[in-house]
Amino acid sequence: VALAIMALMATLGWRVLASMQTAVEINRQHADQVLTLDASLAQWGMDLDAMVELPLTRTLEWDGRALHLTRRSGSTGSDGAIVVAWTRASRNGQFQWLRWQSLPFTSREGWQTAWNEAHNWAQTSQDSTDRREVRLTGLAEWQVFFYRTGAWGNPLSSTGADPAVNNSLPDGIRLVL
């Protein structure tokens, strides 16, 4: 009887250890996901903070699928500027939040090329092998709102808005994931 009780206790002990190991692994995966999302949001903030208005170019555009922006290339901007695009697209059969950035440029022609590349990349729904694409995290859906003239609104909405206001940079950008 004692041997049977000890065998039962040993079996239960191993089950407890296996359950604890599973819990540790689940917590580790969750922590990794949270850290990835935190780093992604930090990059989002850095991109918005580094936006730069260049003559005869667009600084920010939301087309309903991707957010495109022009930003300084480095912390000082002496290396020129880059175009960054953020979008949600299917990669490997799962929707992902993605970021893409152009090579640095210093001319309007370079900006136009980078802007067109960003638009082409964002419209591509199949898996991309572009080295400038970074897959950030799984994302079911996302929404972007601009804060202009004292209210949050859809960036694509132009109802009752002054065209000069719609073409200016918003006072704030809200991201809903």
Regions found by a protein language model. Name each.
Residues G64-N154:
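Type IV pilin-like appendage domain
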Residues W152-L177:
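Short, surface-exposed polybasic-and-hydrophobic patches located at secondary-structure transitions
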Residues L48-R71:
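Short, glycine/small-hydrophobic-rich surface segments
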Residues E61-D63, S78, N167-D171:
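Solvent-exposed loop and beta-edge segments used for protein-protein assembly and interaction
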Residues V1-G45, D49:
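Aliphatic-rich helix starts adjacent to a transmembrane/signal segment
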